[in-house]
Amino acid sequence: MAKPKSIHYIDNEKFLKEMVIYKRGLDEAKSKDELPPMISEYLGECFMKIAQRLSFRPNFINYAFKDDMISDGIENCIQYIKNFNPEKSSNPFAYFTQIIYYAFIRRIQKEKKQLYIKYKTMQSAPSLLENVEVSANDGDKGYNQETMNTDQKANMYNFIKNFEDAKAAKSVAKKPTK
């Protein structure tokens, strides 16, 4: 009878062994004042698998910038690989999953900030259009037509309000009380 296939997509024991080997090479390179060793193919594959699988969680699945989130997660894993301590933790899967999770959160926050800037610019655009004169040569070519319907405008204004409210609440929380 065939051995049942493992449901885990990463072998944590092998991942830990590879991390110990990498950490040993990193310590040797540091003592010899050399460049750090290259990350093994297996470690890179693990980072990629963790990031891809985490991107399928319900709280991350529907973002248009999912590839950017995955790239940020892998980049952060490579950046912080030297901080993993096998003497403290024997679970590199959890360590790197957490790094990728917070990279995803940071990317979402960056994208929301960019969307906020875009919406604020669009919100101020009507006031800019009021100061523009349409010449008689333009005729009825539709230059001043609305490009957003009322639902889209409502969503934009709600997003702006929620973003500004969250920002205000965050700044109030940071202020020390007397």
Listing of model-derived features with the role each one plays in the protein:
Residues 1-68, 127-178:
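Extreme N-terminal regulatory/targeting segments of RNA polymerase sigma factors
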Residues 5, 12, 74, 85-87, ...:
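Alpha-helical interaction segments
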Residues 29, 51, 74-75, 82, ...:
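A generic structural signal for ordered alpha-helices
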Residues 45, 49, 53, 68-75, ...:
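Structural recognition of an alpha-helix C-terminal capping motif at a helix-to-coil junction
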Residues 53, 102-117, 134:
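Arg/Lys-rich amphipathic alpha helix in sigma70-family domain 2
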Residues 57-65, 77-99, 110-115:
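Short alpha-helix-to-loop micro-motif enriched in aromatics/charged/Gly
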Residues 118-130:
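Single-stranded nucleic-acid nicking/binding segments centered on His-rich, glycine/basic loops
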